[in-house]
Amino acid sequence: EYETGIEHPHAQFRQLNKNARGNYLMPLFATSDVREISPRGEVVKITRLEGTPFTTLALANGNHWVACGDGHSLMEVNLDNGEVARRYGENDIKGARLFFVAGLLPAKDGGLYVCNWQGHDKNAVEANSPQVFEINDKGEVIWNLNDNERFGMISTISTIE
């Protein structure tokens, strides 16, 4: 059991993931940090970031992708020391303006699927930016989905095999 110290439930967290050490990575909206929590509920590490962190995704190099929600950004971060290896801001990815960066999913070819939730910006649909897209390791869009009429807001995805 772990108490976040954040009173309003909607300001707490969306997705928890376990890291290689068996601890939980808890991105918190209200405090703009990712907390590493042991299975006993003890804080192991707090890494301060930007925006409203939504989820983390472990990389083979030990870093993590962090979707920074309303920060309109996606970052590759070493959560042990807080060092940012890569950061994509709102207009840094050609062909995909970032809105609320939410769910992340690794692609089989080494790319990254990014859910670009558009619910907090009334101009998002008019911006014609994809709701979900895949980037390669150079940050280039190689696939996208942009069909608000059929799919509405997309915050997370998963694969079905």
PLM features: what roles do these ranges have?
Residues 1-161:
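Histidine-/acidic-rich catalytic cores in large beta-rich domains
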